Every structure is written in structure tokens, then in C-alpha cells.
Amino acid sequence: MINRVVLFIMDSVGIGALPDADQFGDVGSNTLGNISKVEQGIALPNLTALGLGNIEDIQGVNPVESPKGAYGKSAEVSNGKDTTTGHWELVGLEVTEPFNTYPQGFPADVVENFEKQIGRKMLGNKPASGTVILDELGKEHMQTGHPIVYTSADSVFQIAAHEEVILLGELYKMCEIAREIMRGDHAVARVIARPFVGDPGNFIRTSNRRDYSLDPFGKTLLDIAKEAGKDVIGIGKIEDIFNGNGITEAIHTKDNMDGIDQTIAYLKKENKGIIFTNLVDFDSKYGHRRDPKGYKQALEEMDRRIPEILSHLNDEDLIIFTADHGNDPTFKGSDHTREYIPIVIYGKQVKAGVNIGTRKSFADIAATISDILNIDDTGNGESFKKFILE
């Protein structure tokens, strides 16, 4: 019997363009595959041993004859390629209507309402890379005290502010105001606080980022598990993505290594249910910034710690390594990419070497976890428990 599942999200680690990638401008994207090509290979011996290289052809990540885990990949049903859409589908909510995006910036009524409520003008109001817009408007922001507001191809309203110009408490208050405005007809999936420090030409975003999400529109695996009396521990930005819904305990992290440390800390504790971890650095530090070398190094750094994670699993534990979308750092632009996600499963009770194939929905993961923990499911997805457990 399995009584604890670790759902371990390697944020943006896609494994090849989906068949509908043309509708998203993402034909040819392949986060893992293209990083390994551009960087002449990638060393992920521990994920390789579990079966990662048996899913797809990745330079330096070879298939193994006897994988220690079960493996496969999944397509996405939802209409999107963003954090919220991906994570919601992973826990059983399929998003058929895409969230609003603002390729021309936010409309005048939104701008006026926001500026009136915060008592300041805003800078920017356009789609932009977060680091590029700091180079462009950071100095003016420091001179005027006006927050920098921008969006992307995702459904986001992002507010950047220097921590010495607009204090964190005030920045978070601005985000709460924006969250109330960006509902209904103007609903965005997330309002994001993007604090930074430093001087013009050398700005650095800090780990004090905060996400303000919409409430999920239906019950997720997390809600069902919580109602069934299970522990649901959110590590990283998980609490923010679900606006706290379905979470019994949450811890925010400063980087990938902290995320792994916290996951291990909770594995050592007495809890039963779900440990839901997100490692965001792949996406935020390397994917959007189109830095394949940094992305590769971050993946290798994570892989080196996998034996440590696995050593803390007990006989009733199961871990699923997966992702929420792609963000190919070799691809055009600076946005997410519409890709398959890898699925690698390990546990003392998991059948080694099983290929679960190509799943039709990320929600198959939710259905499987519901099945394993013997709780109700969301009605979406198809469980693959029978293939992976003795």
C-alpha cells in the first residue's frame, strides 16, 4: 500500500513539441532535447537510471536496458502552456477556455483603475521579458517611484519594483489591488510581484516573488485529498498557484536546492498524503532568459541530488518526476513552449521498467494519485496505477 506520493515538478522541463504546437507557434520546440543538442549532451545519470532516456531520444541521456522506475510522457488537453494551466491539469482540472492574454498591454480602464487605487502612475504596460524591461525602465522607476507593469504571452499581470523604492509590503498590496481588478471580463490567471535590487545595468530579481492566482474553478485532487484527511504539503510556488486551496501546509523556497532540501525535510516527517514540490529555477532563471547552458547546469545539479531524495523514501512512498509545460531556452522569443511532459515514477513498490506510454492528459497523473491513495477523483484523466504497482 502506498500512503504518500511526492509530485515533483521540474518546472518547464518539456520533452518535445505537442502535435498542436503549430497553434502556439512552437513547432520544433523540445526543452530537454534541444538543450542537450546545443550543449553537446547533458549528464543526468540518476534520472537516466530511472528511465528518462527511455522516453525520448536525448543526446547524453541514453535508454537503459533495465530502468529502475516506470516512465512515459503526457500530452496536455488544456488550451494553454502556462504555469496555472499546467499545474491545474496535473491535479485534475482541464482548462478548455484559455485565460485572457494582453499582447497589446492592458486596456485604459484597467490602467486608470489601478493607478487611482495605488496613487501612482505605472510604467511599461506591454508584453516584455522581465529582465529586459528592468534594463529599459529600472532607472526611470528608481527616479519616479512608479511601478513597472508588464505581461507576457501568458495570462499574467506582473508588477516589478525595486525593494528600496517600493517596500515589499506595499508591492504585495499593489498586487492584491491588481488581483481584485483582474477578475471577470479582465481575469488573468496570475498577478505576480517581481521585486528586484541593485543598480541600473546590474539589477537582480530577488526570491521575494509572490504569485496571486485565481481560485481553481472546480475541485482538484488537492481539495479531495485534504477533505479525506490527508496531508497536502505545497513546496515552492504551489500554494500561490492554487491560491491556498487544498493545501494543509505550505513552504516557500528561495531556489531549486532549497526546494529539494524542504522536500527531504518533509520526507523525514510523519505525514501521509501528497508532497507537491515545484522547482522553478529552470523556468524563471534559464528558460525565459534563453540560457541553455545555465538550464543544463541546473538540471545536472538537481540530478546529483536525486539519490539523496530517493534514500529518504520509505516503503510506502512513491515519487513522480514530471513538468508543467516546456520552456525551450534554444527557441525564439522568451515564452513557454507547448510540449509533452516527461513522467518518471519510482518507489519500492513500483514495477521497474514499465513504459506507461503517451498519456492523453496531465490529469492522468491526478487520477493515478487518487487511485493510489484510495480517494475520490476529479472525473478527469485515466489512472495508470494498474501498470505501475504490483
From Swiss-Prot:
Subcellular location per the Swiss-Prot or TrEMBL entry: Cytoplasm
Record's function text: Isomerase that catalyzes the conversion of deoxy-ribose 1-phosphate (dRib-1-P) and ribose 1-phosphate (Rib-1-P) to deoxy-ribose 5-phosphate (dRib-5-P) and ribose 5-phosphate (Rib-5-P), respectively.
Positions that bind Mn(2+) 1: D11, D324, H325
Family to which this protein belongs: Belongs to the phosphopentomutase family.
Pathway(s) this gene product operates in, as recorded in its UniProt entry: Carbohydrate degradation; 2-deoxy-D-ribose 1-phosphate degradation; D-glyceraldehyde 3-phosphate and acetaldehyde from 2-deoxy-alpha-D-ribose 1-phosphate: step 1/2
GO biological process, one term: 5-phosphoribose 1-diphosphate biosynthetic process
Residues where Mn(2+) 2 binds: D283, H288, H336
Cofactor: binding comment: Binds 2 manganese ions.
Transmembrane segments: none
Entry protein name: Phosphopentomutase
Cofactors, names only: Mn(2+)
PANTHER family referenced in this protein's UniProt entry, alphabetically: PHOSPHOPENTOMUTASE
Species the sequence originates in: Alkaliphilus metalliredigens (strain QYMF)
EC number(s) recorded for this UniProt protein: 5.4.2.7
